[in-house]
A protein has these predicted regions:
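Acidic, metal-coordinating catalytic segment for phosphate/diphosphate chemistry
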Residues: 1-13
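Conserved Nudix-box catalytic region and its N-terminal flanking loop in Nudix hydrolases
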Residues: 18-60
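NUDIX/MutT-family hydrolases
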Residues: 90, 101-133
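C-terminal alpha-helix
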Residues: 132-140
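Active-site segment of metal-dependent pyrophosphate-handling enzymes
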Residues: 59-98
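Short loop segments at secondary-structure junctions
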Residues: 19-21, 94-99, 114-116
């Protein structure tokens, strides 16, 4: 369900861990980000949106979601000549799967250590989201 330009868009995505690495996807425009996508009418909640998008974009469908952490980012971008507000709900998940089948929406992927991922992520808000996730993991006894 894509909204009209100028109306609030909502997306959901995962910071996806595999042991001590996280998954980043590269978009055709060149930027690197986490798997995410727009909420659709058939989605029952934000977790189902994030999981559907993860599966569509990477082929990964088996994840364990950390329900104790969520981060919301908000920003505005230009779509069809109009400023469009967007909110993204980020969740933390883990998987044992490492093989990625990229969709047509992306050109590359990398599993990276958190420090390397933070350097590669294009947008500052997403770097901050990664730092927040890392703090949550550390407070839960994970040292990444």
């Amino acid at each position: 369900m894509h909204s009209r330009p100028g109306s609030l868009e909502t997306s959901c995505g995962f910071i996806l861990l595999n042991f001590d690495s996280i998954l980043l996807l590269q978009y055709p425009q060149g930027h690197w980000s986490f798997p995410k996508g727009h909420v659709e009418k058939a989605d029952s909640d934000h977790h189902s949106t994030a999981l559907r998008e993860l599966t569509e974009e990477t082929g990964i469908s088996e994840v364990s979601i950390d329900g104790s952490w969520c981060e919301k980012t908000e920003y505005t971008y230009v779509r069809r000549g109009r400023e469009t507000p967007k909110q993204v709900f980020w969740y933390l998940a883990e998987t044992d799967e490492i093989d990625v089948r990229l969709s047509h929406e992306h050109t590359n992927y990398l599993w990276l250590q958190l420090d390397d991922a933070e350097e590669l992520i294009t947008f500052e808000q997403e770097k901050e989201t990664l730092r927040s996730a890392r703090e949550h993991l550390r407070s839960s006894g994970r040292n990444l």
